[in-house]
């Protein structure tokens, strides 16, 4: 949940900054081919920068502390559990971190399967049984083993490319109609101020709308991560963990930022912008074995 939201926000910010730099420096492509190349470079560039920054951003955002050497029995159990599951999943031992938060949560991130991070909240360790916590950790290990962050990066790169390309095509048309006069030497994109304003606004708007695609993919991969956890530690443990989440403390952020929602209580249109499917749907998918085949 958290890794996807941070990735999308960082990615959108990088993409907009690139667009601002291009417009302010007057680097505006005058041909469709040139614009497409620029969109590809900056679309995928923003995604990969977000991916490379993901571990640092995630740790900074929650104040997480990487465990170098276990200092108590709880940290020792956590390290041993992650090591065992990583070995079962065929990946290198991830870095392990703990962050202070009352809510039950965990996330995994990293640019590569063999250079990843798993972080859990103190709320998870305090409020979940060992079996439930084991299932949540296995869920995050499955995300790493499945390469979900890299796949998300590629999907986001394609989405970014279309957002930049379409936004700037429309901006060129708008600048030409509303203020551009190419005969007076204002450039092939028409009025530069209008071009700059329209392109920036459209990139923001289309970027938010395009997040529907990436959120759908995130929800789809959550089902597979649940199935991966069931294969690693057992279906009943994962179901028990999800049932625990239904009755857990609800973070304040979940009421104002749907990208961070994990409780699955939201309905209707807002589900399009959720990173996770509703918990009841995830439990039903595990019971039916739909993603375990």
From Swiss-Prot:
Assigned keywords, A-Z: Cell inner membrane, Cell membrane, Hydrolase, Membrane, Metal-binding, Metalloprotease, Protease, Transmembrane, Transmembrane helix, Zinc
GO CC terms, sorted: plasma membrane
Needed co-factor(s): Zn(2+)
Location in the cell: Cell inner membrane
Topology feature Cytoplasmic, residues: 1-3, 55-157, 214-293
EC number assigned by the record: 3.4.24.-
Membrane topology: Multi-pass membrane protein
Cofactor note: Binds 1 zinc ion per subunit.
Active site: 140
Pfam families named among the record's database cross-references: Peptidase_M48
Biological-process GO terms, alphabetical: proteolysis
Residues in the Periplasmic compartment per record: 25-33, 179-192
Spans through the membrane: 4-24, 34-54, 158-178, 193-213
Sites where the protein binds Zn(2+): 139, 143, 222
One GO molecular-function entry: zinc ion binding
InterPro entries: HtpX_protease, Pept_M48_protease_HtpX, Peptidase_M48
UniProt cross-references to NCBIfam families, sorted A to Z: PRK05457.1
Protein family (similarity comment): Belongs to the peptidase M48B family.
Protein name per the record: Protease HtpX
Organism of origin: Salmonella typhimurium (strain LT2 / SGSC1412 / ATCC 700720)
